[in-house]
């Protein structure tokens, strides 16, 4: 399971999850992705369970990228312990997820949209946040490349 090798401090405050994800909200590696629509904590066990479900479904077909990392320690007190006497010990690690955050990406030559959608659906069941399947639109990608080529040509014409 995922966890940091070392941290500056053993324990953290719980914090608040306000607003939407400003980083990690676009597809960077693959063609298909699973995007969070709610905020919440995703534990290292849930990330691993989702990864296994997707990997088993696609077999050796493509590649999976995990875009979140559990870097927040969650502490717990022992059962039937009286109040007070300090904060509990770190028990597990969570990743703080805000709406819009990309959780997993999938890509490869052999991966079709239907295969990716089904694999992501299996992963959705393992996660505590509401998610949606998104994909890169090929037409949109090609048009953006053409626009950059046109802008480069116009810049060259201006220089001359």
Swiss-Prot record:
Gene: rplP
Gene Ontology molecular function: rRNA binding; structural constituent of ribosome; tRNA binding
NCBIfam families: rplP_bact
Region described as Disordered: spans on this chain: 138-160
Organism: Prochlorococcus marinus (strain AS9601)
InterPro entries (UniProt xref): Ribosomal_uL16, Ribosomal_uL16_bact-type, Ribosomal_uL16_CS, Ribosomal_uL16_dom, Ribosomal_uL16_sf
Regions of compositional bias (Basic and acidic residues) in chain numbering: 147-160
HAMAP family attached to this UniProt entry: Ribosomal_uL16 (MF_01342)
Alphabetized Pfam families for the sequence: Ribosomal_L16
One BP annotation, GO: translation
Quaternary structure (record): Part of the 50S ribosomal subunit.
The entry's keywords: Ribonucleoprotein, Ribosomal protein, RNA-binding, rRNA-binding, tRNA-binding
Gene Ontology CC: ribonucleoprotein complex; ribosome
Name of this protein: Large ribosomal subunit protein uL16
Family: Belongs to the universal ribosomal protein uL16 family.
Chain's role: Binds 23S rRNA and is also seen to make contacts with the A and possibly P site tRNAs.
């Amino acid at each position: 399971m995922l966890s940091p090798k070392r941290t500056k401090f053993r324990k953290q405050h719980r914090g608040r999850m306000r607003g939407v994800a400003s980083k990690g909200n676009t597809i960077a590696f693959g063609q298909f992705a699973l995007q969070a629509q709610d905020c919440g904590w995703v534990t290292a066990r849930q990330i691993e369970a989702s990864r296994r479900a997707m990997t088993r479904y696609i077999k050796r077909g493509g590649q999976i990228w995990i875009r979140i990392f559990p870097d927040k320690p969650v502490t717990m007190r022992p059962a039937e312990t009286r109040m007070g006497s300090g904060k509990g010990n770190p028990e597990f690690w969570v990743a703080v997820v805000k709406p819009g955050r990309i959780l997993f990406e999938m890509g490869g030559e052999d991966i079709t949209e239907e295969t990716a959608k089904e694999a992501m659906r299996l992963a959705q069941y393992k996660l505590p946040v509401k998610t949606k399947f998104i994909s890169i639109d090929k037409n949109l990608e090609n048009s953006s490349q053409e626009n950059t080529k046109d802008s480069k040509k116009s810049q060259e014409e201006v220089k001359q």
